[in-house]
């Protein structure tokens, strides 16, 4: 694969007017497979720039992630990207997984360090014979060749970063290792995203940074997810959505409105696109698209 030229996601983002993309997770059972298929079918007509498939903690979904991403490559018109983490794998195992992706027709990878084996907030320990950080995984992907590679970015800073500037320095290191684009963790204030971009550009980060959008359809669920990342949903967002507590329909509508307004502000401010965390459901994303007057 070394030396092959891939028209990857980084190129697609730079070439297009704006990018829309969706994230899915590997289903655990037949019902989950059906739900994912429905979501993909509903969102495919919107011609996303790409779709991504997550990688379970400690490599727990390794085979499923490769299989699902490969199916998207072979059975749909979509450009798939597989996630890959350092956690629980040796360098040789990571190389084998990348070759499995290539054999399945997947040529885009999101390279992540991953959460510590004992869970978010616990000390990070690399696997013996493995890699320590995402920039090392990016370098391995580029060494193997034939892939376009993206990385994560953090508008509010990674929980382990010493400061926001330190966090940007880490992103710059991933770019220097070969990353072609970045996708942010979820956030709820446009100023957090634009602050990241400003700090990044000042430090020399010039790859596209896609904002990651998490629609709030269940406030408690999203609050738990934010806590796992070491942050909180902003009080103004919580108050706006929680004002409808007891009325699930109204809670959902308020959450969708919050996300749609955020998306409008991001696009108006020059964000290169939007990456939606779908949780394998299409309805919330389609409702946001309707609010944005997105056409296909």
PLM regions and their residue ranges:
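N-terminal amphipathic alpha-helix/helix-capping segment at the start of soluble metabolic enzymes
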Residues: 1-22, 29-30, 34, 142, ...
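Glycine-rich, positively charged N-terminal anion/phosphate-binding segment
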Residues: 3-10, 33-41, 46, 59-78
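Active-site pocket-lining/capping segments in soluble small-molecule metabolic enzymes
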Residues: 3-6, 128-154, 206-256, 261, ...
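Active-site mouth loops of central-metabolism enzymes
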Residues: 19-35, 57, 80-92, 148-166, ...
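Conserved, mostly hydrophobic/aromatic
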Residues: 23, 51, 101, 174, ...
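Glycine-rich, proline-tolerant flexible connector loops at the mouths of alpha/beta enzymes
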Residues: 24-30, 48-68, 116-128, 180-193, ...
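Glycine-rich anion/phosphate-binding loops
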Residues: 35, 86-103, 128-132
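Catalytic cores of alpha/beta
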Residues: 89-100, 165-170, 192-198, 218-224, ...
